[in-house]
Amino acid sequence: MSAIKEVKSELRQFMKTLLGKISKEETQRQTEAVFEKIIESKWFQESKRLSVYVSTSGEIQTDSIIQKALEMGKEVFIPQFTKGSTAMDMVRVPDQTAFDNLPSTLWGIRQPEPKWKWQSYHETGPLDLILAPGVAFSPYGLRCGHGKGYYDRFFSTHHKHFPENSPKKIGLALREQIIGTIPISETDVELDEVIYEGETIIFDTI
């Protein structure tokens, strides 16, 4: 294991313990604060095709964001991945009822069954906004994911499909997920902003 991978592994273990101590009530309180900042933002209001992660424990909850986006008539895409694959697709949520009935699959993450054949984003065009999760975030726009590399590869794949279209990349964080620094490798992709209760960190105003 390389030095960077080892440090990231230790960071994930530390954050897992830390985030496990946060109550559901506190997570919900911070989620509501982040939700208000998101729906009031210009980039959310103007977005037409956005990707939103489907939340689990220990992170900002996204059900209300997805519901709001659908109510506003936006095209909402969520992650879909399969066991043994390193690739992650973003597939369109048909409607609120379909989202509410998502089964819990790998790692307890809700996603559609492959046989449902939800439409992939690249069949109809680029995304203009991606709301990404993470284990930890730095004050400089770096994120530490869960170690599978799904989002970094997805960012790269989106660029290959649509090199002229760069979606806004936003990280959503609990306050406890903001740390001083994160070791990086050449495949790590920087975010444009990190949104959390009490503050917004902007790294790229393009």
Swiss-Prot record:
ATP binds at residues 8-12, 143-151. Its EC number is 6.3.3.2. Substrate binds at residues 54, 59, 146-150. Belongs to the 5-formyltetrahydrofolate cyclo-ligase family. Keywords: ATP-binding, Cytoplasm, Ligase, Magnesium, Metal-binding, Nucleotide-binding. NCBIfam families: MTHFS_bact (TIGR02727). It comes from Caenorhabditis elegans. It is found in: Cytoplasm. Its main location: cytoplasm. GO terms for biological process: folic acid-containing compound biosynthetic process; tetrahydrofolate interconversion. Mg(2+) binds at residues 152, 188. One of its GO terms (cellular component) is mitochondrion. Monomer. This is Probable 5-formyltetrahydrofolate cyclo-ligase. GO terms for molecular function: 5-formyltetrahydrofolate cyclo-ligase activity; ATP binding; metal ion binding. InterPro entries: FTHF_cligase (IPR002698), FTHF_cligase-like_sf (IPR024185), NagB/RpiA_transferase-like (IPR037171). Its cofactor is Mg(2+). It catalyses: (6S)-5-formyl-5,6,7,8-tetrahydrofolate + ATP = (6R)-5,10-methenyltetrahydrofolate + ADP + phosphate. Contributes to tetrahydrofolate metabolism. Helps regulate carbon flow through the folate-dependent one-carbon metabolic network that supplies carbon for the biosynthesis of purines, thymidine and amino acids. Catalyzes the irreversible conversion of 5-formyltetrahydrofolate (5-CHO-H(4)PteGlu) to yield 5,10-methenyltetrahydrofolate.
